Amino acid sequence: MDDWKPSPLIKPFGARKKRSWYLTWKYKLTNQRALRRFCQTGAVLFLLVTVIVNIKLILDTRRAISEANEDPEPEQDYDEALGRLEPPRRRGSGSRRVLDVEVYSSRSKVYVAVDGTTVLEDEAREQGRGIHVIVLNQATGHVMAKRVFDTYSPHEDEAMVLFLNMVAPGRVLICTVKDEGSFHLKDTAKALLRSLGSQAGPALGWRDTWAFVGRKGGPVLGEKHSKSPALSSWGDPVLLKTDVPLSSAEEAECHWADTELNRRRRRFCSKVEGYGSVCSCKDPTPIEFSPDPLPDNKVLNVPVAVIAGNRPNYLYRMLRSLLSAQGVSPQMITVFIDGYYEEPMDVVALFGLRGIQHTPIGIKNARVSQHYKASLTATFNLFPEAKFAVVLEEDLDIAVDFFSFLSQSIHLLEEDDSLYCISAWNDQGYEHTAEDPALLYRVETMPGLGWVLRRSLYKEELEPKWPTPEKLWDWDMWMRMPEQRRGRECIIPDVSRSYHFGIVGLNMNGYFHEAYFKKHKFNTVPGVQLRNVDSLKKEAYEVEVHRLLSEAEVLDHSKNPCEDSFLPDTEGHTYVAFIRMEKDDDFTTWTQLAKCLHIWDLDVRGNHRGLWRLFRKKNHFLVVGVPASPYSVKKPPSGTPIFLEPPPKEEGAPGAAEQT
């Protein structure tokens, strides 16, 4: 090895030096800084370009405004501009404008499309049965009204007739049937369809399908009909396609005088339909009312909360009656709408009232309950000095002396802690059981349907424990519970000052309304002076009841109380009957008596300590439950209380609670 020499061609070996951690991280940081500088430079350049573009836009805008000011055009308000709006150019030549309309009718689905845009589609199960009606503006083609009438149910055909009669001449009418629409389609409705030019509508049969397009007072533009082949089946689906020529804007407008009221009217009538003479060109119905002031009005500054949803035609009718009542203060009225629906707010604006919308909370009964809570809370927040609030619903007619009735009785709520509310509604006040508009009662139930609520009761008791959104409870049933009422009573009139006209709602249909609401008596006499109002205070009322029972003639208990002959053919007398009532919640006989008297019998209402007061044959009729009522002492020793046994319940028959 002594003679070994390294090759001159091989590079000398040297140990590889490992890069330190410091140099490694320095290298990485240098690269990151370079990337960051590059991004920052790009961002600055982008901002510079944006600033330059914006400056150019501002200069162009100023130049355009300057040019416009040199040649100004007459200023146009909303209503004038609306009249000159042209709809989009439809197919056709020249000035002829045409809508393409499709209408579909079947067992489970209906739809309407206008120029390819679906304006109605209903395929929900167990909903939307009956005749769907759409109204289009004949000049613009926009939808002015959408309604569905369940003409399988009673009285819905009457509502349809009323609506169609209120549509202005010239409007485009579209009708289509879902499921079944003929069962309660009476002759009056068929005659109206015939007058519109329909051939199939008046002959509509069980489960037929039908689609119709026409102008009111003008030609039929298309119609299709499929007859059901058997009772157990439906007609084939029909699809109607037709052209609808549009008319000029001049034909669709009214030329009212330019006033603030008419501007409100024009705004309303250009958007919606089905409100009759309020949109008449020749003689429109007033939208401002001047009822007589109420002397010594004790409810002048009491806020009025109108609880509403998406039933604008109901709201329109209700507000007209409310604003016509003597002593009304429009500035105290607030309409609370459950949801952001446009047409109810249009109705509110038409009358120049305050409207508040809010997002619905909950479903079904819970949604209604939360709507009431939100509305009541908002009312007392809007009027922090108010001691009371009047609560109304959108489906009530209001009597002309509604505020007079409240003005004469509201002091009772201040002076008597044993009172829960004052209500304008008598649950048992039917045409054949109510007689005296000056007479008041105390009752253990809370009727609602036009009532006065004390602020302290709501803020201190009800609001803190109001049912939460997940509880599917009816708010009024909750308020009637003993835990809320706590032995307190409500003041009601013998003759109601409100009338429940609504037949469409969460817990309402035509059958139910026909049975329990249609024949309620409603006061139409103005200026009624209530009699002996202070006798409604707790102690005084007991004196009054004992006086009545002492003067009352005991009826013959061997007779059937359901027969007309049970009461003599007299007038102005006071009679009393004693029925079996073993304990406070034993209402077996009363329920059967209420049923045969054709008054409210689904649960117990209108009673005071086991006593019911009503009229029969214009005689004051008292019913006392024995032995539960303290007034049982007035029963003659020899008399036997009347007992009416309920009929045996049929197997599978629904109970009262299920029927409501």
UniProtKB/Swiss-Prot annotation:
Bias-annotated ranges (Acidic residues): 68-80
All residue ranges annotated as the GG-type lectin domain in the record: 97-258
Disulfide bond positions: 254-281, 269-279, 421-490, 562-596
EC number, as in UniProt: 2.4.1.-
Residues engaged in binding Mn(2+): 395, 500
Superkingdom: Eukaryota
Region entry Interaction with O-glycosylated substrate glycoprotein, spans: 473-481, 506-512, 600-605
Topological region Lumenal: 59-660
BP terms from Gene Ontology: O-glycan processing; protein O-linked glycosylation
Binding site for a carbohydrate: 129, 179, 207
Textual note on the cofactor: The manganese ion interacts primarily with the substrate UDP-N-acetylglucosamine.
Compartments, record wording: Golgi apparatus membrane
Pfam families membership: GNT-I, ILEI
Start and end residues of each stretch annotated as Disordered: 68-93, 633-660
Main localization (coarse): Golgi
Subunit structure: Interacts with DAG1 (via O-linked mannose moiety). Interacts (via transmembrane domain) with FKTN; the interaction is direct and is required for normal location in Golgi membranes.
Known role: Participates in O-mannosyl glycosylation by catalyzing the addition of N-acetylglucosamine to O-linked mannose on glycoproteins. Catalyzes the synthesis of the GlcNAc(beta1-2)Man(alpha1-)O-Ser/Thr moiety on alpha-dystroglycan and other O-mannosylated proteins, providing the necessary basis for the addition of further carbohydrate moieties. Is specific for alpha linked terminal mannose.
PANTHER family given in the database record: PROTEIN O-LINKED-MANNOSE BETA-1,2-N-ACETYLGLUCOSAMINYLTRANSFERASE 1
Protein name from the UniProt record: Protein O-linked-mannose beta-1,2-N-acetylglucosaminyltransferase 1
Species assigned in the record: Pongo abelii
Taxonomic classification: Eukaryota, Metazoa, Chordata, Craniata, Vertebrata
